């Protein structure tokens, strides 16, 4: 059979051209899918990392929003450390907000609302930080006054004791007692000023007026003040007490009045700013939570991209096997055509096969010899195919290495994200436990406050009963005073009656003297009459003896009357002194009633304050419970994120194994060292 080398050569060229076109298309598709897979995996990893950072920032904003509210209230209450914590929290929130405010979210209006809320909270935080020196100085002054006022009260108690002991005027005793009440009112007014609220302005005005009145009364007791009706204290010991009181008042109280009144408006601004932050912190927490949820929803769109990358990698592997199958089909077709063409080509083919024997073992370093016979075209085509196969194997090796490297990096990143998510879940669990403990503590505070409120209410009832007892005592002392006055009047009338008896006794004494004189004259006349006047002399002697006995009796009566008058005068003086003491006791009892009314008022105020503390503690406990539930939800979401990241890492690990399998599939081919 004659061999047509020209026809065979043209057929081979046509078949090779068609195969090259198909191979190029397959190579292009393989390269496209490999690049697409790598780009998709890198983009997914970058996007996931950015989304996780946004979620972390939003979570930080949620926590810091509550820290700002807590630190603002503590700073306004005079806690020096709270100002530093507030400044740190403010900067932390601003930093987190700057990092996420330009991110794209599904609800842009939420970002605008959050910006508005933060601007308001940030401005009020600046007000608090600006007033740090004023608040701390004012609380320091208040603490100094709180330590000084008890000393003033103790000194005035000494003054009152001395005045009572020395029987001073009741008005002086009342003024001295009033000073202790004024000192107590000054302390309460300062406390109300520091607490802020609606009554703070009134408390500041009351503080100024009470401090001024305290100073005027103090100076009046030392020097006297006719306008206020205060007499100067003369007792040296009492004056020593008053001098010490004046030194304390001038050193601590008087110098602090103007400072407190001048800085009180700025303190009110700080308190209002803290209250505003506390009210808006819940809205800030809700908007931060909304932002966190939007960022978490954004991460859910990453997983289709990951699967798209896996599909692209699978298609790349499929294209590789299609190329190999195409090559095998071309080789088989060429072999069939050669065998069917002519058996005479067997020798040339065997020679060519001998040269290419190592190619069957995967040795791509062989090179077929191109001769002038018909095997030359075959050798040339085989050499071309070997070159293409070399390029293909080299491309597969390089692509597999790149895919494996990218998969390892992506897997490392995913595992790092999984570890970070697990660590975040642990931290959230710890925070949730701490919040639960805080809720238990707040419940205990609420229970203690409720019990204190009950005790304060009992104190109010006791003070009320004490006031009633004092009123009854005053009424009884008034009755005693009236009875003593009535008795004094009767004793005075008895003295006047005894005076009249004395006058009558004097008259009787005069009559007795005159009778005695008449009897003496009668006796003289009887003796002059001689025997005829003897009987008349006996009568005259008897009359004289009766007159002498009457005179002696009248002297005894006169002595008794004088004794009665003396006792009556002493009784009148004693009754008047008793009446004065009763009046003084009534005034002291009335002052005690006023003091009990003050105690009742203070106890009511204390009960209201304790009730407010209890209500606030219950509200804080409810907020802490809500935070704990929220933290549990965050922990569950973080656990799900960690599980998803771990699953992604396993999928990427499978991709790396597929790349290794692809390298193993071409490991049997031997390439030239220079390539």
Swiss-Prot record:
Protein name per its UniProtKB record: Putative methyl-accepting chemotaxis AlkN
Purpose: Chemotactic-signal transducers respond to changes in the concentration of attractants and repellents in the environment, transduce a signal from the outside to the inside of the cell, and facilitate sensory adaptation through the variation of the level of methylation.
Major site of localization recorded for this protein: membrane
GO cellular component labels: membrane
Organism (species): Alcanivorax borkumensis (strain ATCC 700651 / DSM 11573 / NCIMB 13689 / SK2)
Compartments, record wording: Membrane
Stretches assigned to the Methyl-accepting transducer domain: 399-635
Biological process annotations from GO: alkane catabolic process; chemotaxis; signal transduction
InterPro entries: Chemotax_Me-accpt_rcpt, HAMP_dom, MCPsignal_dom, NarX-like_N
Lineage: Bacteria, Pseudomonadati, Pseudomonadota, Gammaproteobacteria, Oceanospirillales
Keywords: Membrane, Transducer, Transmembrane, Transmembrane helix
Topological relation to the membrane, as annotated: Multi-pass membrane protein
Pathway as given in its UniProt record: Hydrocarbon metabolism; alkane degradation
HAMP domain boundaries: 343-394
Listed SMART domains: MA
Signal peptide span: none
SUPFAM superfamilies, per database record: Methyl-accepting chemotaxis protein (MCP) signaling domain (SSF58104)
Entry similarity comment: Belongs to the methyl-accepting chemotaxis (MCP) protein family.
Gene3D superfamilies: Methyl-accepting chemotaxis protein
PANTHER family attached to this UniProt entry: METHYL-ACCEPTING CHEMOTAXIS PROTEIN CTPL, METHYL-ACCEPTING CHEMOTAXIS PROTEIN MCPB
Record-level Gene Ontology MF annotations: transmembrane signaling receptor activity
Keyword Transmembrane listed: yes
Domain of life: Bacteria
Transmembrane intervals: 24-44, 303-323
Keyword Transmembrane helix assigned: yes
């Amino acid at each position: 059979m004659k061999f047509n080398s020209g026809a065979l050569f043209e057929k081979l060229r046509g078949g090779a051209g068609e195969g090259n076109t198909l191979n190029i298309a397959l190579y292009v598709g393989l390269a496209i899918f490999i690049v697409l897979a790598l780009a998709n995996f890198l983009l997914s990893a970058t996007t996931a990392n950015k989304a996780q950072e946004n979620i972390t920032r939003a979570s930080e904003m949620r926590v810091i929003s509550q820290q700002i509210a807590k630190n603002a209230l503590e700073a306004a209450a005079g806690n020096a450390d709270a100002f530093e914590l507030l400044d740190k929290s403010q900067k932390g929130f601003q930093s987190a907000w700057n990092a996420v405010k330009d991110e794209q979210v599904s609800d842009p209006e939420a970002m605008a609302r959050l910006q508005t809320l933060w601007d308001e909270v940030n401005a009020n935080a600046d007000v608090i930080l600006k007033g740090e020196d004023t608040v701390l100085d004012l609380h320091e002054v208040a603490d100094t006054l709180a330590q000084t006022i008890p000393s003033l009260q103790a000194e005035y108690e000494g003054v009152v004791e001395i005045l009572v002991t020395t029987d001073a005027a009741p008005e002086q005793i009342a003024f001295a007692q009033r000073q202790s009440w004024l000192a107590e009112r000054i302390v309460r007014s300062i406390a109300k000023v520091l607490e802020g609220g609606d009554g703070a302005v009134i408390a500041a005005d009351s503080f100024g007026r009470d401090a001024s009145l305290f100073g005027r009364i103090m100076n009046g007791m030392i020097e006297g003040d006719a306008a206020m009706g205060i007499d100067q204290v003369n007792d040296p010991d009492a004056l020593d007490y008053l001098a010490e009181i004046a030194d304390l008042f001038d050193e601590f109280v008087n110098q602090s009045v103007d400072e407190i009144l001048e800085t009180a408006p700025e303190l009110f601004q700080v308190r209002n700013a803290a209250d505003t932050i506390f009210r808006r912190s819940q809205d800030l927490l809700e908007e931060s939570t909304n932002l966190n949820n939007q960022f978490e929803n954004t991460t859910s769109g990453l997983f289709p991209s990951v699967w798209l990358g896996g599909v692209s990698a699978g298609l790349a592997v499929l294209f590789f096997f299609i190329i190999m199958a195409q090559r095998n089909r071309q080789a088989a077709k060429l072999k069939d055509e050669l065998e069917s063409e002519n058996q005479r080509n067997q020798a040339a083919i065997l020679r060519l096969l001998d040269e290419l024997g190592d190619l069957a073992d995967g040795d791509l370093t062989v090179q077929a010899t191109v001769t002038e016979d018909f095997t030359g075209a075959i050798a040339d085509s085989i050499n071309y195919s070997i070159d293409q196969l070399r390029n293909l194997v080299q491309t597969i090796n390089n692509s597999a290495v790149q895919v494996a490297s990218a998969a390892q990096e992506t897997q490392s990143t995913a595992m790092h994200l999984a570890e970070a998510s697990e660590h975040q879940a642990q931290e959230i669990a710890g925070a949730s436990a701490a919040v639960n403990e805080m809720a238990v503590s707040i419940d205990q505070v609420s229970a203690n406050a409720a019990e204190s409120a009950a005790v304060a209410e009992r104190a109010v009832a006791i003070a009320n009963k004490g006031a009633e007892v004092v009123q009854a005592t005053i009424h009884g002392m008034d009755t005693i005073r009236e009875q003593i006055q009535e008795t004094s009047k009767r004793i005075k009338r008895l003295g006047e009656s005894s005076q009249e008896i004395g006058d009558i006794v004097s008259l009787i004494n005069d009559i007795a003297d005159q009778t005695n004189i008449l009897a003496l004259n009668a006796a003289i006349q009887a003796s002059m009459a001689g025997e005829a006047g003897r009987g008349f002399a006996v009568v005259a002697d008897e009359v004289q003896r009766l007159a002498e006995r009457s005179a002696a009796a009248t002297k005894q009566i006169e002595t008794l009357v004088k004794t009665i008058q003396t006792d009556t005068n002493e009784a009148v003086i004693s009754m008047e002194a008793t009446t004065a003491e009763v009046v003084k006791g009534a005034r002291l009892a009335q002052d005690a009633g006023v003091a009990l009314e003050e105690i009742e008022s203070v106890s009511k105020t204390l009960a209201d304050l304790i009730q407010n503390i209890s209500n606030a503690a219950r509200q804080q406990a409810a907020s802490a419970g809500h935070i704990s539930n929220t933290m549990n939800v965050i922990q569950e979401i973080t656990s799900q994120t960690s599980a998803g990241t771990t699953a992604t890492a396993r999928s990427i690990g499978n991709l790396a194994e597929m790349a290794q399998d692809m390298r193993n599939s071409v490991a049997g081919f031997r390439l030239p060292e220079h390539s």
